Amino acid sequence: MSIKSDKWIRRMAESTGMIEPFEPGQIREADGKKIISYGTSSYGYDIRCAPEFKVFTNIHSTVVDPKNFDEKSFVDFHGDSCIIPPNSFALARTLEYFRIPRNVLTICLGKSTYARCGIIVNVTPFEPEWEGYVTLEFSNTTPLPAKIYAGEGCAQVLFFESDEVCETSYKDRGGKYQGQQGVTLPKA
């Protein structure tokens, strides 16, 4: 398995719709102001957060159970930025829609700009033939409220191409998050 370059990412995005919308360069400024960068980098793609958030709250004092998750644990919020309470988290989704080729696996890592502020972005790998908007998890590890920005970079996707095609893809096995459209809560 080898990591793929900016040239490969551009070619795949433009010819197969692997990433939509796609930014072929690296954007660091908008409307004359500095932003957290997004777009194609040397060996990855910096994804953006959409203005759609689910902020975790403890108002119902419930147990967090991934097999029986209570939707009332979240407050829905739409906006250009989102404040995450201390020691809490928020879910969001990418602006970009992904279509992963059958011989490719991705790993997604948080951007250091957020990590240096105690905000950790967690995303699982995008498996072969998975497609959809990516659900993002932002953890605020600080004792203070933390701000995240919609429309700006939040994580980097690295693409790895296998030397052979997998026998069973995410699509083949009917993966439960296939084709997700919005912020998607846990499914057992």
Swiss-Prot record:
GO terms for molecular function: dCTP deaminase activity; nucleotide binding. It catalyses: dCTP + H2O + H(+) = dUTP + NH4(+). One of its GO terms (biological process) is nucleobase-containing small molecule interconversion. It comes from the Bacteria. DCTP binds at K111, S112, T113, Y114, A115, R116, T135, L136, E137, Q156, Y170, Q180. It holds the Pfam family DCD. The keyword Zinc does not apply. Pathway: Pyrimidine metabolism; dUMP biosynthesis; dUMP from dCTP (dUTP route): step 1/2. The active site is at E137. HAMAP family: dCTP_deaminase. Catalyzes the deamination of dCTP to dUTP. Homotrimer. Belongs to the dCTP deaminase family. This is dCTP deaminase. It comes from Polaromonas sp. (strain JS666 / ATCC BAA-500).
